[in-house]
């Protein structure tokens, strides 16, 4: 479908456009005003965002490139409840102190990837705790709650699916929909925000906000959803068997981040290049047309470009150089370091513990299974003894050991 506005044509071509509450109306608004304020919300349930959030972050950047103003809404208030959308059970209630720490950490990550300044298109960071923490319950029920139909709320797939499974939905969680809807109203009144963007799982919450705006006689509000970032197997991006693919380099090294995208399924390369990088469409078409072993060159481009956006050009180039040197030139010295203390080596470190401590395996049980399945190597030699111990004898030939878990995960273990 061809649109009048360049922005909608762009996001449709790159695969961002999933649903819109009024696509013709939004198209005309973008065409007539040449300026719009839009927001994307992020929960503060963890100290870092992960790879699954990249599609939202890229959308923030694209809004700026087209001359629009993006608002990042951090859910310092709503995280105290937790979004029940398509969840099997209630999230654990986080202490307020943890939520505040997570909010600060997420802000630092976003500031590396999105341009925040006082210009017309400079992004803003807003925390919904600023207004939600001060709500008076009786006033909120009377002024806002009166506009919500419980029957309608129960009809949304995000809620209906959970109830159909006879899984409990607490009254606390049920209130989340009202609070997110109210966020849109606050952002419209304070910043003239007319557009909310979110993942496809947020459709019900977004529609609630738009309908509330109508009942409060606000200018027409719009909602736009993007597809969830799934891999070829239909699993959400951002999580692996050994943990989440964090955007914070203190939680996941740029080298491992690069490797994650280097190892995506062949079928995902073109789509991820469109959604997660700024590589031009014509170049993407050439890269995704590569076959057999040549597709690996496209994967390297994907990994490097995605790493540049998250960690900067220098870290991306270092990660690529280290990976190519280690795998193609067999130079283990360029692998990322994992440092262990002399005292640990003196007393001996269990290989099982080391696989777990490095983050290669999520548990000691998984580490044992890897070893027993001949999936662990030290200096390219298979080790299948779960009682194997790393000591000073392990370092007699060189100042480090190369530890491998499977074919694609490698690290250099160094004694401090």
UniProtKB/Swiss-Prot annotation:
Subunit and interaction comment: Homodimer.
Organism: Wolbachia sp. subsp. Drosophila simulans (strain wRi)
Motif ('KMSKS' region): 236-240
Binding-site list for ATP: 239
GO molecular function (one): RNA binding
EC number(s) recorded for this UniProt protein: 6.1.1.1
Role this protein plays: Catalyzes the attachment of tyrosine to tRNA(Tyr) in a two-step reaction: tyrosine is first activated by ATP to form Tyr-AMP and then transferred to the acceptor end of tRNA(Tyr).
Pfam families with a match to the protein in the record: SYY_C-terminal, tRNA-synt_1b
Protein's recorded name: Tyrosine--tRNA ligase
InterPro entries membership: aa-tRNA-synth_Ic, Rossmann-like_a/b/a_fold, S4_RNA-bd_sf, SYY-like_C, Tyr-tRNA-ligase, Tyr-tRNA-ligase_bac-type, Tyr-tRNA-ligase_bac_1
Domain of life: Bacteria
CDD domains from the UniProt entry: S4, TyrRS_core
